[in-house]
Amino acid sequence: LAWGDTHFANGLAEALRRLGQEVVIDAFAARNRATSAIDDVSLVLRGPRRIDPPAHGRSLLWIISHPDEITSDELSKYDRIFAASIPWAARAGARLGHSITPLLQCTDAVLFRPQGIPRGKDIVFVGTARGIARPSVVAPIEAGVDVTVYGPDWRRFIPGRFIRASGISHSDLPARYESAAVVLNDHWPAMQKEGFISNRAYDVVAAGGRVISDTVEGLQEHFGGAVRTYDSTSELIGMLRGDLDDLFPSYEKLDAVSRRVRMEDSFDARAQVLLDAAIGTLAR
């Protein structure tokens, strides 16, 4: 599990435990754990690397990123398959010959919720540089827009004065998101192309924050105005130079969207879907 995937797994595990399930999390290195035979159901969170399920018990696959790497052979190993994209689930299901159920990403509604912190003026980005000059961060800075960056590997791409820290505690993210004027977000090219909405958008909106992101199919509609999208860096820069309050709905509408996300797009909601699927496979 990578950094973000670890928090995702922990949040989902806690939600399943609240539903009365006994849950163990295996990192990638433990994917062939010798005691896996005692598990009734294995759930694989498919990120950058393929993981074949244990030979024993039932297995569920939830594809949350890197859809361009999925093969029919990989899917054939699982009893049920979910994917965090509505359009990709339909297209890939037809192309690869497997039934794929849409199950969008989500947020930890226990952690990510408004705390009543006043909105400040910081334009915030949280994440690694990925070894590239990510346009969503570099282009605004080069255009004279101040961006407060949290994350590693940025020093060769932007001046150090824009880097607030090389990381931020997961527990500190809700307050940082809520207090930001706006949080910038972007996607891996394959995720953007295939309609995989990153879970950062869910986290920020659940915490009461506002997001500007690159365009992904269904993103702006799903978040009811709490997320605004751009199609080019010039459009992004124009948005950031303008009055950000004019881009987003009123506080009351944003609060309603935040409550809906915490209710409908929580780990608890997703855990219930996965538990129902697991019970269904065990009943076969």
Model segments located where?
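Catalytic core of nucleotide-activated saccharide and alditol-phosphate transferases
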Residues: 9, 52-145, 154-155, 265-269, ...
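Short glycine-rich anion-binding loops that position phosphate/pyrophosphate groups of nucleotides
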Residues: 47-49, 65, 189
